[in-house]
Amino acid sequence: MPIKTFKPYTQSRRHMSVSSFSNITKTSPEKSLTKIIKKKGGRNNTGQIMVRFRGGGHKRFYRIIDFKRDKFNIPAEVMSIEYDPNRSSSIALLQYLDGEKRYILYPLGVNVGDLLVSGPDAGIKPGNSLPISNIPVGTFVHNLELVEGKGGQFVRSAGVAAQILAKEGDYAHVRMPSGEIRLIRVKCYATIGQVGNLDHENITLGSAGRNRHMGRKPHVRGTAMNAVDHPHGGGRGRSKGNNQPRSPWNQPAKGFKTRPKKIWDWVIISRRNKS
């Protein structure tokens, strides 16, 4: 979707940009596919803060998304393309021939009225879901399963796509959006094409108010805290007082490896690109 900018009649509007929503065809969601989300403010069941700087924001209804695409060999018509406040990508409403409706992630290039199918015999066209064994090498895919039948877990953000590079036995070599090349079982399902809403990465919020509207609270610097609250806190003036940057829990930051060497690291052929 194209990006809309504004004249700088205030300082926050100067750099603000929003999506034009030009491809959105329906404004209200399908009521049977929504449920209420209760905001937690980053807290767990005992009230402790598990994720800092979360809270507030606009009320949202959760749209139930079909990540499994397990209604095989039944054509579904794309009824509408809708906005989803819970994710960066748009969503598409499908209606199957038997009358059932489901939401899926909106694949780039799919239009209202198109027919989509999932199953081993589906054609290679954007929006169709197939096992990796039936997808040609070089094809771009999204909504990629990691465990057979569990539903898509990888490649679901706006504008991303993974590429199938090779197939060898029970596994396929897949290049992820991060640049990592890893093995995924060929029985896992993936959806053809790229996730829509490509211009999401170009949107600039422009004001603190829009951040609060999304449920994000101000991120406090460690040097602005007291010594009891952060390793960088305290002291005379704004000085963190130590040489190496650290997290609030005193773990070295900026380059310190925190990922454990797990048993299944053998599935990673090539590590991701590091910026």
Swiss-Prot record:
This is Large ribosomal subunit protein uL2. SUPFAM superfamilies: Nucleic acid-binding proteins, Translation proteins SH3-like domain. The gene is rplB. One of its GO terms (biological process) is cytoplasmic translation. One of its GO terms (molecular function) is structural constituent of ribosome. Residues 222-257 are annotated as: Disordered. Keywords: Ribonucleoprotein, Ribosomal protein, RNA-binding, rRNA-binding. SMART domains: Ribosomal_L2, Ribosomal_L2_C. It comes from the Bacteria.
